[in-house]
Amino acid sequence: MERIDIMRRVALVDYGKLVLQDNCGDIKALEPGTVKIDVTACSICGSDIALYRGKRSLENERYFGHEFSGVVADPGDGANGIKKGMRVASELSRACGHCWNCRNGLPNYCRSMNDALLPGGFTEETLVLNTPEYSFISPVPDTIDDITATLLEPTNCAYHVARRADVKHGDTAVVFGMGPMGLIAARIIKSMGVD
């Protein structure tokens, strides 16, 4: 199996302490079902901020940054039509795709969340799970720039909330909290014809 040599990454080494590292020793080998991506942009998620501020356990988090875009450097098995040179964006990138929860549509309860994305999105290269059954990357059209593409995962989350709210054209809805997620949810709900 090919070993990936990472040149640099931003790592959270302690609560409130980010360090630019020149060598990432914890990246695993490219294995079947894995895609290597040259990262071009990475956004900061609320979960990254919570980790930075010490509201989440560093022991349970081995990566930093999961909302990113980039170019496929090695498509691995090439599942789901992913090809070398393709522009992609990540989605929920932390689940393993193999455990009972993942196989039953509950990736947010994966017990191996940290193994699917190492060393994270704040690096020059990273690995993402992509199998015929489970993929965490989506192609990005040329009409969307790299920075905007990093919003794929939070947009999917906001869309899921809008669908679960079961609002329909002509309904009235209120979104509490106008941070990034609230703003995205408000735009999605508005596009559905909701006041």
Task: Give a label for each model feature.
Residues S191-D195:
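Conserved S-adenosyl-L-methionine
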Residues R9, I37, T172-A173:
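Conserved hydrophobic helix-helix packing surfaces used for dimerization/oligomerization
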Residues C96-F176:
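NAD(P)H dinucleotide-binding glycine-rich loop of Rossmann-like/cofactor-binding domains
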Residues D26-I27, E59-G65, N114-G120, V128:
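Short Gly/Pro-enriched turn/cap motifs at secondary-structure boundaries
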Residues C45, G78, M181:
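Conserved Rossmann-like nucleotide-cofactor binding loop
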Residues C157, M181, I189:
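Hydrophobic/small residue at the entry helix of a nucleotide-binding pocket
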Residues K28-C42, K55-R103, P139-T143:
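Glycine-rich beta-strand-centered segment in the early N-terminal region that forms part
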